[in-house]
């Protein structure tokens, strides 16, 4: 079954890391990996403005589900390339922002185990991983007379550390800073950095404003849709469709107003409809664990008690069958699951005794509430989750 990793896993020679290094090369900054040839072709034309707009989870399969072939996005689709592993926002956006593979930058998933703190930490919020209250029960009945889990079943999020654990223990220099330090000019347009545009329209307005200014420049822009909506409603919901169609129209309008600009639209990963389980319903598995799994519901990082290390593989397969590919730490490192760069110091300490990779539509959450409210997912080992578009508009 490990052959599935080799055939369906990421293409680390044609992925987000390579696109990032194409940008670095174009603006005279030092590269750390090969470039993406399909992007180099357009970058070589010397447009005054180069914009990379990353739309979270707007993968190739999502374009095909929702948008017309002759629409702006699909008619300008120049290539389909690969996310990284796991195909998820923390790992993938850090790869495009750093030009590094996940095994180099260490931002491996939504919840990362930090041995320095001996905690599973939600990287972006710097809180201890979400957990369920001991003895929690569902307390709301829906219209179908089914019990639902409320947020009152969850423990209050607690700060993991005084300073960001991820930036403290896994620092990296982003490509905007690297280009500026190399003598180029680069700017972000995302809600997390000044001037903190807090809507998609404001992100696009900032792109237009920067492109109108004189001089050669690179702009990296990011927005968290359609990922946010698809997590809550699935990939084919009316809500997801409306968001995706609206975003395409707004980007098309922006492109019509630009000049001497290369606009590249891409995604960090794609998205799929998930069949969700909660690991707390499998005590035979949780009894084996030192702590609840980290990383992602479709890439589970297991630290196993000594007395179960030999039997865990059999116990896991008994409960979850062939829905996951279970790898040992040694196999994860030997197979270069997280990238083909040089392993970051301490990487092996962040990887558990076993890592389970989803090869079906099943996801395993640590709380019943999350399993209930997240019908859309990603971060597993299916081709659908990896394939991302290279949309190119020249103006």
Kindly label every feature range from the protein language model.
Residues 1-395:
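Feature captures the catalytic ectodomains and active-site-proximal regions of enzymes
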